[in-house]
Amino acid sequence: MTQDTTAIVAQHLAQAAAAALPEEVAEKTRLHLLDTLAAMISGQALKAGIRARSYVMSYAGAGEGRASLPGTALWLPPVEAAFAGAMAAHADETDDSHLAGRFHPGCAVVPAALAVAEHIP
């Protein structure tokens, strides 16, 4: 991005944050958040969720952070909670999809946003 492009994006984000969302956008946002949270919880019982949780606990340890891992009783450092949550959310591919972009934004964005939101007082 050029500086001009960065400034345009920054200005748009600053203005968007202050504006109310249209109700249909707010409803779609709620549905995507709930869908991703459900995928994070159900994914904890699947191989990818179990392995991610085991991996982060092998060096981070439980109870050493300020971010929860949905679907478990664990509290982890935010980066580890986001990683393990993202792995679980995508474990059985029930997470959301952006058809035009052919990607799953929720499994990366929602766990990270939740971890940061819990970490920041």
Regions found by a protein language model. Give the residues of each.
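N-terminal core-entry segment
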Residues: 1-121
